[in-house]
Amino acid sequence: MSEYKIVYKGGTGEIVEKKSRFIANVFKVESEDEALEIIEQTRKKYWDARHNCFAYIIGENGQTKRCSDDKEPQGTAGKPILEVIEGAGIINILVVVTRYFGGTLLGTGGLVRAYSGAAKEGIANSSI
């Protein structure tokens, strides 16, 4: 059996990039249904946000991996969040990053950095 990390207690992290707020919430999940339910709850909690992008990895061997850009340009939100999770070597994890648009377009590079940065911050503030 290979070594892996799991979330003991989820956390949050927030960064601000050109007046846009990126709020990451990290959750421990055991199934895809649980992840989808939490994503829906997060959308309701942050109903006034522009985007709720997410990524999750579920299963001992990371069998289930999903991500969503939630109407951000393709590959600028969900994939960077997923890459942060993979880089940290964590399974049974869901990271949802909520964006409140600040009025300034960040460009694709800026979005990737912001979503990655928020995800890293959220994971750093979680107990793994």
Residue ranges and their predicted role:
Residues M1-G75:
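C-terminal regulatory domains involved in ligand/effector binding and gene-expression control
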Residues D33-E40, K44, E83, R113, ...:
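Solvent-exposed alpha-helical segments within well-ordered globular domains of core cellular machineries
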Residues A49-C53, K79-L82, A119-G122:
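Glycine-rich loops and low-complexity Gly/Arg-rich segments
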Residues A55-G59, E83-A88, N125-I128:
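Short C-terminal domain-edge/linker segments immediately following a structured domain
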Residues G75-T104:
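Ordered, amphipathic secondary-structure segments that act as subunit-interaction surfaces
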Residues L94-V97, T104-I128:
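Glycine- and Gly-Pro-enriched alpha-helical subdomains that act as flexible
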